[in-house]
Every structure is written in C-alpha cells, then in structure tokens.
C-alpha cells in the first residue's frame, strides 16, 4: 500500500480557515486553533441571526405602520382588522413602505379599513 502524505491537504485546510478568519482580533486571526473556534462561533451566529432578521424586520414594519395609522386617527390592530374585513391583501412590508413614502395612498387604505370595521369596533 502506498504511503499517503497529507501535508498539502492539511495546509490547504488551515489556509482556508485562516483566510476566512481575516479581520478578527489578535490570535483569532493568526493561530489556526483559535481561528477555527472563532469561525465555528461566527457561523453559529450567522445562522441564528439570519433567522432573527426576519422577525426584526417584521417588528420594524409593524412599528412604522402603527405610527402612520395613529397619525391618521386609528390604532394598528383596528387598521389590520379593517383591512382583513375589506379583503385587502397587502403585506406589512408594502404597508410600511407606503406609510413612509406615500402617505396619501396609506391614508386611503386607512379610510378603507375604517369603513369596513365591524359595528362597535371603531
């Protein structure tokens, strides 16, 4: 059986880890073992935060929509209830975009929601 020399593969593996750890502080960018540990943590944080980002944006959109609806004399939950009753299917991302960039169109949606609220809800 032929002898297998693993120096090339090991060096390549270490080099890729150290290259991806570039920019880290201190030993974490220079020593292989420290860099590898930091890369594992970094990947964990990236994975977690890619999922958390979705909730963060939803909270931001809801905050913006709530502020705009209150300027138009209505609360967020009544606004959403009225839109649902009217059959308007616009997601929160678009509603927040309208609230920031096109206040007249948003005010029209608030009026639609207000007209379609059930009796006693307003």
Curated annotation (Swiss-Prot):
The UniProt transmembrane annotation reads: none
Q: Does the keyword RNA-binding apply?
A: yes
Q: Name one Pfam family in it.
A: Ribosomal_L20
One GO MF annotation is:
structural constituent of ribosome
The UniProt entry, under PROSITE patterns, shows: RIBOSOMAL_L20
The record's listing under InterPro entries reads: Ribosomal_bL20, RIBOSOMAL_L20_CS, Ribosomal_protein_bL20_C
What cellular-component terms does GO give this entry?
A: ribonucleoprotein complex; ribosome
**Superkingdom classification of source:** Bacteria
> What's the family?
Belongs to the bacterial ribosomal protein bL20 family.
Name used for this protein in its record: Large ribosomal subunit protein bL20
Taxonomic source organism:
Saccharopolyspora erythraea (strain ATCC 11635 / DSM 40517 / JCM 4748 / NBRC 13426 / NCIMB 8594 / NRRL 2338)
Its lineage reads:
Bacteria, Bacillati, Actinomycetota, Actinomycetes, Pseudonocardiales
């Amino acid at each position: 059986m032929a002898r297998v020399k693993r120096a090339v593969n090991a060096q390549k593996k270490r080099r890729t880890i150290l290259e991806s750890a570039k920019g880290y502080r201190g030993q974490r960018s220079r020593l292989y073992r420290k860099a590898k540990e930091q890369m594992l943590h970094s990947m964990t944080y990236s994975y977690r935060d890619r999922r958390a980002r979705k909730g963060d944006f939803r909270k931001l959109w809801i905050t913006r929509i709530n502020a705009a609806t209150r300027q138009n004399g209505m609360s967020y939950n009544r606004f959403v209830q009225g839109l649902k009753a009217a059959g308007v299917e616009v997601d929160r991302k678009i509603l927040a975009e309208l609230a920031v960039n096109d206040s007249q169109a948003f005010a029209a949606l608030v009026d639609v929601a207000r007209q379609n609220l059930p009796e006693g809800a307003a």
